[in-house]
Design a protein with these regions (language model features):
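Conserved glycine-rich cofactor-binding loop
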Residues: 9, 16-17
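Substrate-binding pocket helix/loop in short-chain dehydrogenase/reductase
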Residues: 90-91, 98-103, 207
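Active-site helix of classical SDR
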Residues: 114, 150, 158
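Alpha-helical segment proximal to the catalytic Tyr-Lys
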Residues: 119, 163-164, 235
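C-terminal substrate-recognition "lid" of short-chain dehydrogenase/reductases
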Residues: 126, 213-244, 249-250
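Residue(s) in the substrate-gating loop at a strand-loop-helix junction
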Residues: 134
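Short, small/polar-rich loop/turn modules that mediate ligand/substrate recognition or access, typified
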Residues: 166, 171, 237-239
Length: 251
């Protein structure tokens, strides 16, 4: 798909590392100019220099800062709503603050950014919105009520907006990865090891074994799917939830 996005501008939130960084590299490799947005400016700067993009530091839980970031971006052809957090707790330990924090970043911020940028895509007659949800958005897992709720919200938003956008030239889809080899998963492995007394290797293996393929997903596999959705030939893929977890949700 080299050159297929030449002349297009993409915005990737949570673009400094992990899945977001892999998607930013893939889009840039296809010719797009990429704006990478996130909270860790050093990571963003390194990636932006690597791909010839632009680093934008922004905390998406700050609505005023988010509005300013979106306004400065102007017209965007490809929007990848990737920024998110994952926290786990039992029901009684899921505080209002935790619930609000996860829902704000994982559901409300993507909605607000999409609402701001899609009208310009409609006017141009072409656009791609790719929401990075999770297989937790099509299933349920213990101790993750807030996270599952947020990712289900993202999937629901994707499906509803697909109806609204069906005749505009703008497509919207959700990618739903399982456990992906990222720093976020490294942090989850550490928490599991601390809580259960397992070694880090045992904790990591337990996550990998949730997939029938007995492995985690590479960030580049998610990036490949995102790039595919940006292609002309994918224009009929619309309002879909594409699960990338090695078959874990089938178990």
């Amino acid at each position: 798909m080299e050159g297929s996005l030449a002349g297009k501008l993409a915005l990737v939130t949570g673009g400094g590392r992990g899945i977001g960084a892999a998607i930013a590299r893939a889009l840039a490799g296809a010719g797009a100019r990429v704006l990478v947005c996130g909270r860790n400016k050093p990571d963003l700067d390194v990636l932006a220099k690597e791909i010839g993009g632009v680093a934008i530091r922004c905390d998406l839980t700050d609505r005023a800062a988010t509005d300013e970031m979106v306004a400065s971006a102007g017209h965007v052809d490809v929007l990848v709503n990737n920024a998110g957090i994952a926290e786990s707790a039992s029901l009684e330990r899921t505080s209002d603050a935790m619930w609000d924090r996860i829902l704000e970043l994982d559901a409300t911020a993507p909605f607000r950014i999409t609402r701001a940028l899609v009208p310009s895509m409609i006017k141009a007659g072409w656009g791609r919105v790719i929401n990075i949800a999770s297989n937790a958005g099509v299933s349920g897992y213990g101790y993750t009520a807030a996270y599952c709720a947020a990712k289900h919200a993202m999937v629901g938003m994707t499906r509803a907006l697909a109806i609204d956008l069906a005749r505009t030239g703008v497509t919207i889809n959700a990618l739903c990865p399982g456990w992906v080899e990222t720093q976020m998963v490294d942090e989850a492995v550490t928490r599991i090891a601390q809580k259960t007394g397992r070694s880090l290797e045992e904790a990591r293996t337990s996550l990998a074994q949730m997939s029938p393929q007995r492995r985690m997903i590479a960030p580049e596999e998610v990036a490949y799917a995102a790039l595919m959705l940006c292609s002309h030939d994918a224009r009929g893929i619309h309002g879909q939830t594409i699960v990338i977890d090695g078959g874990a949700v089938l178990k």
